[in-house]
Regions:
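Ser/Thr-glycine-rich phosphate-binding loops at phosphate-binding pockets of nucleotides
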Residues: 37-41, 103, 127-128, 223-225
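Conserved C-terminal "lid"/linker of ANL adenylate-forming enzymes
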Residues: 150-153, 193-252
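Adenylate-forming
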Residues: 115-143, 171-182, 201-205, 219, ...
């Protein structure tokens, strides 16, 4: 009613939608379907209204061709592809090859043609024992938790996965006080247990730290389009990260 009373469906894009969040909106009578697009290629996929699949970004739109590279990267060909980056042939050549746009996203395509984004190629974590982990998919599982604002998975060339969390302080705005709260710690510990129960052992979060501030543009941890700069976060919070890889492996 607050949205006018005639809203029947909403679309989501730009970042993975957690399954729990999608289920919540469906339960309250507002299906939230996912699609996928990018500046260089326009809208690429959308879930069909009559048969959406949770966790999928849908099927390619008319005129759009998709395929996967050998490493799983999603490639797109369509009339909507851009001609190239302005006065930057080197950058253009890196993403446009033989009429295909290399998206940088790792994807799976099922037998019915539904596409699932599993991570970003450049954000791939490879553990010290060679296991490949796509952090974006796991991070998206925390979206339903109201106390969590941001989450960053760590584990590249390391023996196990850890995480940094920032907090959603709501109206109080006091994340420093929240970060010291035993109740908040238990909430996040329970959230980690919930997510871990959905993951194979090599992807499970073994330790975590709760930060008393957000990742910010001013500190170089976020881009102007609000994407996390993982390397800068690791540099700025290297003490917290080092602590998680010292001593025993159980969660803290």
């Amino acid at each position: 009613e607050r949205l006018g009373g005639r809203l029947r469906v909403a679309a989501s894009g730009a970042a993975p939608l957690g399954k729990d969040l999608a289920s919540f909106f469906e339960a309250v009578g507002m299906p939230l379907i996912e699609g996928y697009g990018l500046t260089e290629g326009g809208v690429v996929t959308l879930n069909p209204l009559d048969r959406p699949k949770s966790g999928s970004i849908g099927k390619p739109l008319p005129g759009v061709e998709l395929k996967r590279a050998e490493d799983g990267e999603l490639l797109v060909k369509s009339p909507a592809l851009f001609l190239g980056y302005y006065k930057d042939p080197e950058a253009t050549g890196a993403v446009l090859r033989d009429g295909w746009l290399y998206t940088g996203d790792i994807a799976e395509i099922d037998d019915e043609g539904y596409v699932y984004i599993t991570g970003r190629k450049k954000e791939l974590i490879v553990s010290s024992n060679g296991k490949k982990i796509y952090p974006a998919r796991i991070e998206s599982l925390f979206k339903i938790e109201p106390v969590i604002n941001q989450v960053l998975l760590i584990g590249d060339r390391l023996p196990y996965v850890t995480a940094l969390f920032t907090l959603n302080a709501g109206h109080s705005g006091d994340t420093k006080e929240m970060a010291r709260s035993p109740q908040v710690f238990e909430q996040i510990k329970n959230a980690v247990s919930r997510v871990n129960s959905q993951l194979p052992p090599f992807e499970q979060i073994r330790k975590f730290r709760i930060l008393d501030r957000d990742f910010t543009i001013e500190d170089g941890e976020m881009t102007p389009t609000m994407k996390v700069r993982r390397n800068r976060v690791l540099e700025n919070f290297r003490t917290e990260v080092s602590e998680m890889y010292a001593g025993k492996e159980e969660s803290q």
